[in-house]
Amino acid sequence: MAIRIFAILFSIFSLATFAHAQEGTLERSDWRKFFSEFQAKGTIVVADERQADRAMLVFDPVRSKKRYSPASTFKIPHTLFALDAGAVRDEFQIFRWDGVNRGFAGHNQDQDLRSAMRNSTVWVYELFAKEIGDDKARRYLKKIDYGNAGPSTSNGDYWIEGSLAISAQEQIAFLRKLYRNELPFRVEHQRLVKDLMIVEAGRNWILRAKTGWEGRMGWWVGWVEWPTGSVFFALNIDTPNRMDDLFKREAIVRAILRSIEALPPNPAVNSDAAR
């Protein structure tokens, strides 16, 4: 509870301070070393708002503009859709597990919004998708200008196996709107989603993030809030070794953020690892 109150006050201060700063773009080819260390191919976009002269830092600018399936990073906007459409009332509503073994212990249990976000519980979001419907989902996607705004699929979930796609650059643009409560949803819903995204927090910083994995590639997107401003990030990498490559997402991002002092080297005060 203390972390949630601190997070709200922290966000209000940061929003007021950095609403109208200027920004330049800088290619960080030197960040190749972080990808090479983990034998990974991918891109990262980092938007650093801690200074008056804000910076957009990019490794592999070409790939940063290429669209990929959002996979479970889509749970961020999908939760907003579900709240707005009434598919879920609040963070306390319980969704009963149907008893089907889905191969992951975190999925084989009753869920609420917090556990569904933390565990990337697909079956909960499949319930939301069915309740919302494709037509309304398409309207929501266009309304928030999310990637190609295409919720079509011939098989499976449209945010994993379907046509929906988004680039790392577009992920950053979306996250910034959410951070500032500028999306076309109730402010209390945007604040709730941001609360659900908290992964770690220290005395004067908060890390909010979400993983995603489509099978062939994986994401880690989010931001770190500091008193001087926030640092947004969106990474995607190829995952030819599938689950064996998943740890690389967070490892690369954390190494890069620490290299620009956007994450502290010390252990976090509170941690809630997301799959």
Curated annotation (Swiss-Prot):
**Disulfide topology:** none
Q: Which Gene Ontology molecular-function terms are recorded?
A: beta-lactamase activity; penicillin binding
EC number in record: 3.5.2.6
Query: Known catalysed reaction(s)?
Result: a beta-lactam + H2O = a substituted beta-amino acid
Positions binding substrate in this chain are 210-212
- Read off the Pfam families from this record: Transpeptidase
What is annotated as the active site?
72 (acyl-ester intermediate)
Q: Which residues carry this modification: N6-carboxylysine?
A: 75
Keyword list (alphabetical) reads: Antibiotic resistance, Hydrolase, Plasmid, Signal
The signal peptide, as residue positions, is: 1-21
Give the family, as the similarity comment puts it: Belongs to the class-D beta-lactamase family.
- Provide the protein name: Beta-lactamase OXA-15
What species was this sequence derived from? Pseudomonas aeruginosa
- Gene symbol here is bla
